[in-house]
């Protein structure tokens, strides 16, 4: 359940108020004044908690829940125990999230809470930097020459904003992050330890590996979120661009000259080599690696732990190493399994194969 020590909730709400906020229907009006103080999963919830159900995998948890109320679709309404108030919703999880955002609005941004609003005494801000009203700079952060920061933005403790960087309004730059050669839009959220604008991995790979100057920038458009430890290299000649609304998980590496479209989703530990292009609404599972100069079309999806060496047409689903259309990938895996079973590859080792005998 939600931790009230780290995320103090708003005052409690009645089920009538929750129904109005989530656009759900309270099935039994006699519960209208029952108050909810927090959120919890079905198995942890108590009488003052709201939970939700939309997956039959959790039927046992629903049958045994002690929750005060449950958001559920009309299809599963009859499964809710009689002591639990029913809030009927077309999309229960969406409704649950709507109330969670209302109840725990502080959890939506990566605040560290180590500094008070305003400029910390130990922050270092160059005299030529321009900060709009209501900017917060936490302890030990460093703001370099000619930096511009928009109102409502928070610069986390120990962050370094190098010369000439421009940051828009209502951003959160996580503690220990480092930004250089970058232009950042409005409402951009960076979790701790992001590194933006360092030089790309550009060399002439021969002899002593001659370094190629990286003279481009990183441009991050509005409403982007970057997970902890994510790194984005600046371009060599053209810019590295992250499109509006894109959400990037922890520990993702994005190489120089990469262009990522709008509203993409990139899960943890992906590695994107230089000069590739992702269209709009592309989804990459965790630990996907993509070769340089590849183009991934709008709406394409790549399964976790795939290796992509070829361009992917718009709207297609690929997976595997090397990645190919998922139907082809599944057929190949099934064929290999049948081949292995038919060849007796899973038979026991020969009795005289005692190479590891006695090994501790």
From Swiss-Prot:
EC id: 2.3.1.191
Segments of skewed composition (Basic and acidic residues): 349-360
Annotated InterPro entries: Hexapep, Hexapep_transf_CS, LpxD, Trimer_LpxA-like_sf, UDP_GlcNAc_AcTrfase_non-rep
Annotated keywords: Acyltransferase, Lipid A biosynthesis, Lipid biosynthesis, Lipid metabolism, Repeat, Transferase
Pathway(s) served: Bacterial outer membrane biogenesis; LPS lipid A biosynthesis
A cellular component annotation (GO) from this entry: membrane
Cysteines paired by S-S bonds: none
Family named by the database record: Belongs to the transferase hexapeptide repeat family. LpxD subfamily.
Function: Catalyzes the N-acylation of UDP-3-O-acylglucosamine using 3-hydroxyacyl-ACP as the acyl donor. Is involved in the biosynthesis of lipid A, a phosphorylated glycolipid that anchors the lipopolysaccharide to the outer membrane of the cell.
Protein name (record): UDP-3-O-acylglucosamine N-acyltransferase
